[in-house]
A protein has these predicted regions:
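Catalytic core of pol beta-like nucleotidyltransferases
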Residues: 1-30, 38-44, 53-107
Length: 107
């Protein structure tokens, strides 16, 4: 992680988490960070991978719309990818689980 401002990267994550939770507070679902940002093995160019589960397809698309462009609104220089884990391949879910996740919302 050479030449990465860890405090700045942490502030991006915290601002993103706070806003994601604010925008989804009325929905019942599970939201978690996964991938390199969750494991701490990120690079300066790494995106934020958010997984959502325990949610209907309709509500998932509602969440995607609520979060569309959030990185620009929060002035975060990284993209945010949102994955519906209820419809993801089992092997992908298994691999993510092995790598570890950072749970942001339980329900």
């Amino acid at each position: 992680m050479a030449n990465i401002d860890i405090k700045r990267e942490q502030s991006y994550k915290e601002r993103l988490k706070k806003e994601v939770l604010r925008r989804t507070q009325s929905l019942s679902c599970r939201i978690f960070l996964f991938g390199s940002r969750a494991s701490g093995q990120f690079r300066r160019s790494s995106d934020f991978d958010l997984g959502i589960s325990k949610i209907s397809k309709e509500d998932f698309f509602r969440v995607k719309n609520l979060l569309d462009g959030i990185e620009d609104e929060l002035n975060i220089p990284h993209s945010v990818d949102i994955i519906n884990f209820d419809s993801a391949e089992d092997e992908f879910v298994h691999q993510v689980t092995l790598q570890g996740v950072e749970v942001w919302k339980q329900r």
